[in-house]
């Protein structure tokens, strides 16, 4: 794939801005959609996104726009990075401007609350029959601030057919941002969304000063839960041993830059979720995803005890100390049975 013009990036949060910078470093012109008019003006005038990626000087190849059509119309390749709770609205607004054969790379990690659809599932629902838009998914262990500093990073790009995935892989990969391809789109999306819920649990554990043993147990058993869910939905179990699975899970559960882990730490210290979120500018996707995972697991009959308890802490104000006791006193199991 050789895009005939600029590449569009829809969303100028920390990750969207960083991906725009990566693509600009590859030599492409980038049209970046910025929702906030004042931020758009700031990026144009100062070459910095002081709201979401402060301290990073942006490439002169990045052109900030407040009009969505300027970023979508006549673009062969689009990267979409908006919060999951507004994803459907933005995708729907893009449709009148999409090229019939455009490629959209989803870089949002989440599951829609009302429909329990992944982001590519939303595209399947909103795209009219006449458009042959190909939707891929980019996920993996990638803190935006580290990628913006050109720290070596590896991620997974999943699509429905290998030719398109490889084409996009060659367009976006750089000397510091390495992309591997996959054909397991649902597995990559489920892993990317679910790991944020486990990161909340790991943060609660850290906030309660439980130590490394507890964190290791949560990550390992959390991976088992994510794998059960993914396999039940048709994923390849090996996906969860890769970058989009255990790689992203490890990073989000242990890294100090993890917003979800940070929220979990404060929950573990006894703070209320509404007070924590009131102080945050950026989105911790795990908070909304905990609700989606709770209902999705119940609907398809998958046991996810850690995710279930995270849901109860956030949405039912359950005491984390009670959660720990209940998790540790569950019926004893054989470790490697997929149903447990």
Swiss-Prot record:
Q: Does the keyword NADP apply?
A: yes
* PANTHER family, sorted: GLYCEROL-3-PHOSPHATE DEHYDROGENASE, GLYCEROL-3-PHOSPHATE DEHYDROGENASE [NAD(+)] 2, CHLOROPLASTIC
Name this protein carries in UniProt: Glycerol-3-phosphate dehydrogenase [NAD(P)+]
Stored SUPFAM superfamilies: 6-phosphogluconate dehydrogenase C-terminal domain-like, NAD(P)-binding Rossmann-fold domains
Q: Which UniProt keywords apply?
A: Cytoplasm, Lipid biosynthesis, Lipid metabolism, NAD, NADP, Nucleotide-binding, Oxidoreductase, Phospholipid biosynthesis, Phospholipid metabolism
**A cellular component term (GO) from this record?**
cytosol
List all membrane-crossing ranges: none
Which Gene3D superfamilies does the record cross-reference, listed alphabetically? N-(1-d-carboxylethyl)-l-norvaline Dehydrogenase, domain 2, NAD(P)-binding Rossmann-like Domain
For the ligand (sn-glycerol 3-phosphate), the binding residues are 109, 140, 142, 195, 248, 258-260
Q: What does the record give as the active site?
A: 195
> Binding of NADPH: at which residues?
14-15, 109, 144, 259, 283, 285
Pathway membership = Membrane lipid metabolism; glycerophospholipid metabolism
State the species of origin.
Syntrophobacter fumaroxidans (strain DSM 10017 / MPOB)
What does the UniProt entry say about where the protein is found? Cytoplasm
Q: Which molecular function terms from Gene Ontology are attached?
A: glycerol-3-phosphate dehydrogenase [NAD(P)+] activity; NAD binding
EC top class named in words: oxidoreductase
Does Signal show up as a keyword for this record? Answer: no
What Pfam families does its record include?
Answer: NAD_Gly3P_dh_C (PF07479), NAD_Gly3P_dh_N (PF01210)
Family indicated by similarity: Belongs to the NAD-dependent glycerol-3-phosphate dehydrogenase family.
Q: Which gene encodes it?
A: gpsA
Catalysed reaction(s) here are:
sn-glycerol 3-phosphate + NAD(+) = dihydroxyacetone phosphate + NADH + H(+); sn-glycerol 3-phosphate + NADP(+) = dihydroxyacetone phosphate + NADPH + H(+)
Single biological process term from Gene Ontology: glycerophospholipid metabolic process
EC number of this enzyme = 1.1.1.94
**Record's function text:** Catalyzes the reduction of the glycolytic intermediate dihydroxyacetone phosphate (DHAP) to sn-glycerol 3-phosphate (G3P), the key precursor for phospholipid synthesis.
